Amino acid sequence: DEHFSTEPDSVVRALFYGLGSDGTVGANKNSIKIIGEDTDNFAQGYFVYDSKKSGSYTISHLRFGPKPIKSSYLISNASFVACHQFTLLEKLDVLKAANPGAVFLLNSPYPAAEVWDRLPRKVQQQIIDKKLKFYVIDGYAVAKEAGMGQRINTIMQTCFFAISGVLPREEAIERIKYAIKKTYGKRGEIVVQKNFAAVDEAKEPAQLKHLQNAVGDVRTLRGAYRHPNTCRMQAFH
């Protein structure tokens, strides 16, 4: 069984795929601090970098749970997978380590109503076969609205906390903003406020869509099937 694990179910295992220049690793390091310092959970993080550094891909491996985490290896069976760059779906097997029923969060430049047709066929099949809970947000649109250019790190971090439920939503937002102030405070209040605005926008249900994929009704993939159903972020099942 490729998804067999000796780790207890109480350990949340999350993978984040990003680029060296998009701030994903920095945001995940902040998330570890938030989870480890502000909850009863223990937290662990490993970070894998492509040799090209800036502009190349990064993979963040985060674990957290109610007991000390002793695992000293990379995650091969994840309950949460986030892809912060749509183009990585063609380059990496992003969902290989996703457990059946896991959450998949995707930053997509396409509207939720179109994103299914834009996915590589293999990714469509994995979502169906593994019955993944699929969420999509246009992080770049939110970043642009907040005046942050291409920096999506705090936006995707907010989505992670909104979906994972590791902290109550408002408490998570408060902790994220505190981390933002510590991280970006030296750059000036304008930078801090732009990040705050991005967090406030990303937490809104209208931004983060849960695609209710009709598993079992899908017969033909990519190009012949347009996923019809989107909803505001409500239940995660």
Predicted regions and their residues:
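A short, basic/flexible loop-to-alpha-helix module at the beginning of a structural domain
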Residues: 1-11
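Active-site cofactor/cluster-binding pocket
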Residues: 10-20, 25-237
